[in-house]
Amino acid sequence: MKRTILYLMLAALALLAGCTQDEELSAKPVIYLYPESDAKPVDYLYPEAEMEVTVSLDYDGELTCVYPAMENGAWSVTASPDGTLTDASGQTYNYLYWEGVSATAYDFSQGFCVPGGDTAAFLEDALSQLGLNRREANEFIVYWLPRMEANPYNLIAFQFDTYTDHARLTITPEPDATLRVFMAWRPLSTPVELPAQELPAFERTGFTVVEWGGAEIS
């Protein structure tokens, strides 16, 4: 998994000679950043009763890792109400995992500037608002926190259509409720000001699919 994410700014004309990256953000917080990879999107499937489920991904980029392996571009599993997934060989999984490289431009026009030491508490609150349950939030936090808490600050923006329009899931049978939480973030040495994001609530009903993932911009 790549830990160093390269980025480019769309607003190249806004760059001033001699400015630091953090000064650029302070002067022009409405920016788009390009990651090199989308890290660890994982998909949980929660049917009301055990059922066969097929999941395919139409991704505007190159997949670099999937687990379990896809067959003919899709996962086919038996999903149980507790989230356990079983493949044709009888092997079980907690979720479906993928990672890829894309040129998607992530939107940082709104978000949060969080001191590194406050990152865990921030994520606990934000992920709960967004609709992750305790297990899902725990797995999200233990994956990302080691990369974030030692930074002076973290610039965090949750991506919605910007992400889902470039990583399209097709799930059969169709879920009753789908939640896709994707966090784009960047370490900072000094704080910046930007409008706070409004985080939408999510209601689980019937067959529910939950995904989380993220991209570090460094």
Task: Please name every model-derived segment.
Residues A11-A12:
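Repetitive helical segments and hydrophobic/amphipathic motifs
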Residues M1-T4:
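Positively charged n-region of N-terminal signal peptides that target proteins for export
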Residues L15-G18:
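C-terminal motif of bacterial Sec signal peptides marking the signal peptidase cleavage site
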Residues Q21-S218:
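Protease-labile, long low-complexity intrinsically disordered regions enriched in Pro/Ser/Thr
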